[in-house]
Amino acid sequence: MKIAFYGSSLLSSYWNGAATYYRGLLKALSKRGYDIVFYEPDVYDRQKHRDIKAPDWCSVVVYEPTAHALMQVASCAAQADVVVKASGVGFEDEALLHAVLDNARPDALTVFWDVDAPATLSELRNHAEHPLHETLKRIGLVLTYGGGDPVVWDYRALGAAECVPIYNALDPETHHPVAANPGFACDLAFLGNRLPDREARVDAFFFDPARVLGSQRFLLGGSGWGDKPLPANVSWLGHVGTRDHNAFNVTPKAVLNISRDSMAANGFSPATRVFEAAGAGACLITDAWLGVELFLTPGEEILVARDGADVAEIVRTLTPTRAKAIGAAALRRVLAEHTYTLRARLVDDIFKAHFERRAMEAAE
């Protein structure tokens, strides 16, 4: 079965938090027999910051950010059995969605894969004229990066034929325990780009604890922080490529996950970083959000902080022995229940069920 997948980038994680999600899922789907072509625009300098080579489990087509190139790649949707348009591609998303739907065969399954569902739904609720309201009627299936029942209910209320969350997970071939790297040694590390809808939470959950714990060392990775005034005990690394994620996660005493505003408000939205860190055997501290216990057990496999004061207290009292035990427990859990192999099995079942239903309807 052929999949045409239109997304932000498979080759680069630069300003592209969905990269490892796409890689893990599509690699696992390829192992289940899918023939996949991923179409990504050359925008935001991502091609200058590639952190993987073109994979052997998926063809990648990089296109210029022009209307002509967009229409050319959209025409390729006609060759696919499953046509996926992801949210947040980064170049003319609305035009691309309409173009791929126009070019998809009548017998193809059309999918809108929302990697930012809480934010998308908020925009739809606040803008009755948003074009996606009408376009949803043309889409066979909505898959989401997470969000649980609240996202499913909202999408169905807006007219989606079907909506299923496909959560982030672990690819143990790329994210796994490694030897510590002294360059990442610290008491607490946070990896995340500077985003308008997360910065206040980063201030509260990372920078404020750093100021309180002035004698401890904090490490910041991610793009966009260059002009941010930092506490003296915070070191900024800039963009940290995928190849360095394991060492970044496993070396500090603990690593921190901070959700974006919309993800925290909605809940049920574990970030890729959660599973990447757990897969490396890291001790992970996360901001509190609804549903965390469905993925990792608080206090045993993950530490949950309600605010910056909680983060400071956790870091102050956390011993290396306990940190290692929490990381080991998290690793066992994600290997057993949260791999992309398991997520791909769910996606495969959904796709096959769709085509089986269609075949039965045609036979009636």
Question: PLM features: residue spans?
Answer:
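Extended catalytic core of nucleotide-activated donor transferases of GT-like folds
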Residues: 6-7, 15, 19-28, 32, ...
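Short, solvent-exposed loop/turn segments at secondary-structure junctions
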Residues: 9-12, 42-46, 89-91, 116-118, ...
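Anion (oxyanion) recognition and catalysis
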Residues: 30, 104, 156-157, 210, ...
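Catalytic binding pocket for nucleotide-activated donors in carbohydrate/polymer assembly enzymes
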Residues: 7-11, 21-24, 39-46, 50-57, ...
